[in-house]
């Protein structure tokens, strides 16, 4: 069977390996997953209780207006319901953005290394990709590329903080850059990890209400998969001016998010004890990863997320990843990004100690 030719130029996104699969494949009893930046404390207790109470409604289609979650988000971010769209993960809203702006005659701009789905979705539209030479968000390079190809570039991605590297621009740096962007070019600020960055440094904090008030061409993305521990329910959102949201709705299928996901997201936003514990654990444990890196002369980039990336000169990241798998520890090998590096999710103290113990042996 023949398929559309553009599929020949697409590669599959490589998600983190599954715990059950690794346990069976490697014959290990205990598996620790530090690969997909999931919440190490699991699902918020209030969300669990909400799911229990609503489990008998799984046969019902969701409220397609999503009014309860939209109103909760609108109150949190001081925006209107018409400024919000809910997606099956923020990935789906990224897809809306790309399909609304890109085609085979234009292009988009991103950092040298950033979230892989931007390029995967854009290639489905035949759009050209411009990347900075620097792997991180070097705004001088962004400006130079944008000015050179201004007529062609219709979409810019700023991943703040950046996945899979962890660095983050100050909010003021991002807004200053956006001022130089044409109003017909959509700037997507992927803030999937911004709660972590804001906790560590208030200068990284992004306010959607201020962004969309100042700029008509900005889309702010948020997710419930990281801080809020709902990755398995697939729910995220976008915040932008009403014209952008209205355009996205023409691409959205009805009932794109389950009723259980919608309910759980509202409950998760009300579980402050859970999110505070998550943030405090993350950055206290992050210090141990920095100490480990220093001890073993491993290069790192200061991370504003719930993960840290280790860069290697002589050791091979694929070999290291395989050896960790044999010990029942799943991390993310970044070879597919062209890096000799691994990304490690910050886990619980027990999970992290297990990683340090086993990785120390591997590095000897």
Swiss-Prot record:
Keywords: Amino-acid biosynthesis, Aminotransferase, Histidine biosynthesis, Pyridoxal phosphate, Transferase
Catalytic activity, as annotated: L-histidinol phosphate + 2-oxoglutarate = 3-(imidazol-4-yl)-2-oxopropyl phosphate + L-glutamate
Pfam families per the UniProt record, alphabetical: Aminotran_1_2
One of the GO biological process terms: L-histidine biosynthetic process
Cofactor: pyridoxal 5'-phosphate
Enzyme Commission number(s): 2.6.1.9
Pathway(s): Amino-acid biosynthesis; L-histidine biosynthesis; L-histidine from 5-phospho-alpha-D-ribose 1-diphosphate: step 7/9
Amino-acid biosynthesis found in the keyword field: yes
MF term (GO), any: pyridoxal phosphate binding
EC class of the enzyme, as a word: transferase
Modified residues (N6-(pyridoxal phosphate)lysine): 226
Subunit structure: Homodimer.
Family: Belongs to the class-II pyridoxal-phosphate-dependent aminotransferase family. Histidinol-phosphate aminotransferase subfamily.
Name listed for the protein in its UniProt record: Histidinol-phosphate aminotransferase
Organism: Campylobacter jejuni subsp. jejuni serotype O:2 (strain ATCC 700819 / NCTC 11168)
């Amino acid at each position: 069977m023949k398929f559309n030719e553009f599929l020949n130029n697409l590669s599959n996104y490589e998600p983190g390996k599954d715990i059950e699969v690794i346990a069976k494949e490697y014959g290990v009893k205990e598996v620790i997953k530090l690969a997909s930046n999931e919440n190490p404390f699991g699902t918020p207790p209030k969300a669990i209780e909400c799911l229990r109470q609503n489990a008998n409604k799984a046969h019902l289609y969701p409220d397609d207006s999503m009014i309860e979650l939209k109103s909760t988000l609108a109150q949190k971010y001081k925006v209107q319901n018409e400024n919000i769209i809910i997606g099956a993960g923020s990935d789906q809203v990224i897809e809306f953005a790309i399909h609304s702006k890109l085609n085979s005659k234009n292009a988009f701009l991103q950092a040298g290394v950033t979230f892989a789905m931007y390029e995967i979705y854009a290639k489905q539209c035949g759009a050209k990709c411009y990347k900075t030479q620097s792997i991180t968000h070097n705004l001088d390079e962004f400006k130079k590329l944008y000015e050179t190809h201004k007529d062609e570039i219709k979409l810019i991605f700023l991943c703040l903080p950046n996945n899979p590297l962890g660095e983050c621009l100050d909010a003021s740096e991002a807004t200053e850059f956006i001022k130089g962007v044409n109003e017909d070019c959509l700037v997507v600020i992927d803030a999937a990890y911004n709660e972590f960055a804001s906790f560590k440094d208030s200068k990284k904090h992004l306010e959607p209400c201020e962004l969309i008030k100042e700029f008509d061409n900005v889309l702010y993305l948020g997710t419930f998969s990281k801080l809020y521990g709902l990755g398995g329910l697939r729910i995220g959102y976008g915040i932008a001016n009403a014209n952008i949201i209205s355009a996205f709705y023409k691409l959205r299928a009805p009932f794109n998010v389950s009723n259980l996901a919608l309910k759980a997201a509202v409950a998760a936003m009300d579980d402050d004890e859970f999110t505070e514990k998550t943030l405090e654990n993350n950055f206290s444990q992050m210090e141990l990863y920095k100490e480990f890196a220093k001890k073993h002369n491993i290069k790192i980039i200061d991370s504003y997320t719930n993960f840290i990336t280790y860069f290697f000169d002589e050791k091979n990241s694929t070999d290291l990843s395989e050896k960790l798998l044999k010990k029942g520890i799943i991390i993310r090998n970044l070879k597919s990004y062209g890096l000799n590096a691994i990304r490690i999710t910050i886990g619980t103290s027990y999970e992290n100690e297990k990683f340090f113990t086993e990785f120390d042996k591997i590095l000897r």
